């Protein structure tokens, strides 16, 4: 599926940057029911924002599907793991940037940022 294709791409990019993570399979083995695509073993900062997990979405982020993801997934990830990153590979509505959860609970991007925007601890 296209979703899996983009998850694998993200996995490759994380490995190239030497960012270690647990994937969904591993998290489920540890007993988590709701899991992001990647839970970082050590948090990173992207443009100064702390990121503990990354969720990959191979679609355009519009108001409707973003609202669904918030309710079904993103609030759970934030409650369990703290702030994270959601990647909408095909872009997202700019107005999502001004919602209360964005830049507080997680940040939105259209790809994994370049190395110079990432601080590794």
What positions do the PLM features span?
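Conserved catalytic cores of phosphodiester-cleaving nucleases, focusing on short active-site segments
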Residues: 10, 14, 36-63
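Catalytic cores of nucleic-acid endonucleases
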Residues: 51-52, 56-101
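Interdomain/boundary linker segments immediately adjacent to catalytic/signaling cores
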Residues: 1-4
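Short, flexible loop/turn elements at secondary-structure junctions
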Residues: 18, 25, 42, 58-60, ...
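A structural preference for short, hydrophobic beta-strand core positions in alpha/beta folds
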Residues: 23-24, 86, 108
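A short acidic/basic microdomain associated with nuclease active sites
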Residues: 11-32
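Domain-level recognition of nuclease-like catalytic cores that cleave nucleotide substrates
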Residues: 90-121
